[in-house]
Amino acid sequence: MNNTKKRGVLLVNLGTPEEATAPAVKRFLSQFLHDQRVVDMTRWLWCPILHGIILPIRSPKVAKLYQTVWMKEGSPLMVYSKRQQVELQAKLNCPVEIGMTYGTPSVLDGVNKLQAQGVDEICVLPLYPQYSGTTTGAAYDALAHALRKVAVVPSIQFIRDYHDHPLYIKALAESVRQSWQVQGKGDYLLCSYHGIPQRYADNGDVYPLHCEMTTELLRLELGLDKSQIGTTYQSRFGREEWLQPYTDKTLESLPAKGIKSLDVITPAFSVDCLETLEEISEQGQESFLHAGGEQYRFIPCLNDAPSHIEMMARLVTER
């Protein structure tokens, strides 16, 4: 990297509750679900629903789910994010900080820490391979809001997406092959991506196109037939139609189609978190086996794998 003494990297992810408690989860969900990028419903209608119904009911339930995946060092998302930070900083030999769109440390915290180290050019890497306004767009909003609060605005390089980057695809393929080597190869590889409302895609969000492209490139890299791999969408919320096919419904239907041994990967998540560890690894396995499946293999996120750190470094140095 050129000018490493003045250039730094800001890794941006969604964020996480600070504790696996109902109050902490409530604070986090309140900030997250207040974002109009996430829920675009009219505020006067949405806010009473959010504060009167959703937060009081969901916060204790979600807190209990977090407790099932919480690590000694804290939230999995934060633990793996910090490991990424350390590894990438060593790889690039330049300052690397973390900034979360919601919760702490915030994007502003990350910018302030970088500037305190003399950084005047920041490469912002939102760790969302596939672009969506609900994630990368929200990260950009958080960055813009943060820059309003600094005395000197640094030069910014913003990486919008990397859904088709060769090193990203190779890193995914490597994780699949490692799983096959250790656990055996299933009849089918299911690529489960976080969903968004179908209406958002209808209004121009390119997210499903990026997801489909990632799956196709992974298929080609692994040499799979189109009948051996598929794309689904998880984590839907509310009654509105979301991107389909739904992951949970697919898991319930695959055994009846003769698929008894299943591999599941979550390419849209750069680190393991509640949605991968609890929803896919635990609930997903239970659903698949209950429907008649026999073997269910969850493939962890790329996290701080060397191939993932190498890809992140390349994304930064290419700019």
From Swiss-Prot:
Domain of life: Bacteria
Positions with a binding annotation for Fe cation: H194, E275
Catalysed reactions listed for this entry: heme b + 2 H(+) = protoporphyrin IX + Fe(2+)
Pathway as given in its UniProt record: Porphyrin-containing compound metabolism; protoheme biosynthesis; protoheme from protoporphyrin-IX: step 1/1
Gene Ontology molecular functions: ferrochelatase activity; metal ion binding
Localisation: Cytoplasm
Keywords: Cytoplasm, Heme biosynthesis, Iron, Lyase, Metal-binding, Porphyrin biosynthesis
E.C. numbers: 4.98.1.1
GO cellular component: cytoplasm
GO biological process, any: heme biosynthetic process
Described function: Catalyzes the ferrous insertion into protoporphyrin IX.
Family, per entry: Belongs to the ferrochelatase family.
The protein, known as: Ferrochelatase
